[in-house]
């Protein structure tokens, strides 16, 4: 058996470097920035054009490493709309290949279990941008998405998008220039960004002179390891929470962790609710419940904080943000986990979250979530949240995990992914601890696989996090791998 690596030291190093390229570049955001030009038509960010040139797939599409249809659709629409502004032969050839892909694959997304964020806003917007550029796109095949767009915008009070923060900030590039300008007046952050979104920030530059927004994008460009632009920036609180949780769950206490725990306590003590970044004005249930769960596992009394989660309670589930079109399995599982520190007091809320999660179960065994493409991510968080309070929901999950493990010890797409394998191990450990699994042989097989991938570089991780396009959060993948290896060691 491979000897266990120094996982505590690796966790300490990870926590000390969280501010280094927290998320990968992706096509969607890079395309919006590639389209920015000066008055002479010269691109403001030529490195973004180069990134698009070198990240088109052989079939003409753009998007993540794994062929997730909705990601390929939105990413390809964004790329061809942006590149259609340029006359270079390579750009024209790339656009034509992208258009051909869209005609050949415009229906693929309908059978996919995934949708990207703001999908119902992005597709109509990008189709319109392509039409204005003279591209021959299969727009008539997406009329039902236009109806979803109308329905989503109809749920928003007329005054809300400009007078108070809303989730539209994150996708502000998809709203009218007039609404974007009103949002910028109130919600553009001191660092120049809006909505933690490079694409939305690029829209501020596109629709008018905004030196602060351009300076923000230039700072991102200077830090980019490959010339592309990330899905989210800044996103420091989200990254901190999701990096800490597996480490704390595994019982690791690396050097420096107390400082990070204090950061979460300070946020909750000050506001009661948590956002994904100090620059983002809208708190959410996911980051809030995550912070509470981490602190509870680390020994903090979170009882005074828990009532704040009731802000997100609805008739039949808990929402992450107001005005969402649908709920999230992982968010409801996380809220149930947070409330499980006071299971008697919050029994109705745990039951409500469990009921929603039960309705989303697939084949009686596993789940998908809107924020991540892997069923192992969603299923792991259900196991974390409900194995101790609602074990009946998970009675067949261990069998599903056993049956879907690959011969090489991994789980997941394309014959196995380190991130998916780590979440499968974390899920199985939770089931074992709850008495819902007894066969630990999958854990020993996974251990060798994860050891082999412990030192993978950032570009070797597939994009599985779900934004308007898919992206990778390498620190979170490594945190899950380190923690899974630490827990698996106990079963060797």
Task: Give residue ranges: language-model regions.
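An alpha-helical repeat/solenoid feature that recognizes helix-turn-helix modules
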Residues: 1-2, 20-47, 64-96, 108-140, ...
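Helix-turn-helix repeat elements of alpha-solenoid scaffolds
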Residues: 4-9, 176-178, 267, 309-312
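Repeat-mediated protein-protein interaction surfaces in helical alpha-solenoids
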Residues: 10-17, 173-188, 225, 363
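Buried hydrophobic core positions in alpha-solenoid tandem helical repeats
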Residues: 11-15, 52, 98, 102, ...
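Short, small/polar-rich motifs associated with maturation and membrane association
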Residues: 55-56, 108
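Nucleic acid-processing catalytic cores of prokaryotic defense/repair systems
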Residues: 58-62
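Terminal amphipathic helices with adjacent charged low-complexity linkers/tails
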Residues: 221-227
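Outer-membrane beta-barrel channel domains
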Residues: 261, 265-269, 273-277
């Amino acid at each position: 058996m491979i000897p266990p690596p120094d996982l505590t030291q690796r966790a300490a190093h990870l926590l000390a470097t969280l501010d280094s390229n927290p998320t990968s570049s992706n096509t969607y955001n890079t395309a919006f920035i590639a389209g920015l030009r000066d008055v002479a038509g010269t691109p403001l960010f030529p490195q973004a054009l180069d990134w698009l040139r070198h990240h088109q797939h052989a079939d003409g599409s753009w998007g993540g490493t794994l062929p997730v249809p909705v990601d390929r659709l939105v990413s390809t629409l964004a790329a061809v709309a942006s590149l259609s502004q340029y006359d270079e032969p390579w750009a024209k050839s790339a656009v034509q290949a992208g258009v051909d892909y869209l005609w050949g694959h415009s229906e693929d997304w309908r059978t996919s279990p995934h949708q990207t964020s703001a999908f119902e806003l992005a597709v109509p917007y990008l189709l319109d941008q392509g039409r204005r550029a003279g591209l021959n796109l299969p727009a008539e095949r997406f009329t039902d998405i236009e109806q979803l767009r109308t329905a989503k915008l109809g749920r928003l009070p007329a005054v809300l998008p400009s007078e108070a923060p809303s989730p539209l900030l994150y996708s502000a590039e998809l709203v009218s220039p007039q609404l974007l300008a009103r949002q910028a007046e109130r919600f553009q952050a001191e660092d120049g960004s809006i909505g933690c979104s490079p694409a939305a920030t690029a829209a501020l530059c596109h629709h008018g002179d905004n030196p602060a927004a351009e300076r923000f994008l230039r700072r991102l460009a200077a830090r980019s390891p490959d010339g592309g632009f990330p899905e989210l920036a800044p996103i420091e609180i989200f990254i901190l929470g999701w990096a800490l949780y597996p480490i704390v769950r595994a019982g690791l206490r690396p050097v420096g962790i107390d400082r990070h725990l204090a950061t979460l306590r300070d946020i909750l003590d000050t506001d009661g609710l948590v956002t994904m970044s100090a620059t983002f004005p809208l708190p959410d249930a996911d980051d809030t419940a995550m912070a509470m769960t981490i602190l509870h596992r680390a020994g903090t009394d979170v009882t005074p904080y828990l009532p704040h989660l009731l802000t997100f309670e609805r008739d039949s589930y808990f929402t992450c943000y107001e005005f969402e079109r649908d709920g999230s399995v992982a968010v409801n599982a996380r809220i149930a986990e947070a409330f499980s520190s006071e299971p008697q007091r919050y029994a109705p809320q745990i039951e409500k979250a469990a009921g929603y999660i039960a309705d989303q179960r697939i084949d009686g065994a596993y789940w998908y979530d809107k924020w991540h493409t892997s069923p192992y991510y969603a299923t792991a968080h259900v196991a974390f949240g409900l194995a101790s309070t609602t074990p009946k929901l998970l009675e067949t999950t261990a069998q599903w995990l056993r049956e879907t493990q690959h011969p090489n010890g991994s789980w997941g797409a394309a014959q196995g992914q380190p991130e998916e394998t780590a979440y499968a191990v974390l899920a199985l450990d939770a089931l074992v601890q709850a008495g819902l699994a007894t066969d630990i042989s999958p854990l020993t097989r996974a251990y060798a696989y994860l050891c082999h991938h412990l030192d993978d570089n950032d570009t070797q991780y597939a994009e599985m996090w779900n934004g308007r396009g898919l992206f990778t959060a390498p620190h979170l993948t490594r945190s899950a791998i380190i923690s899974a290896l630490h827990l698996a060691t106990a079963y060797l």
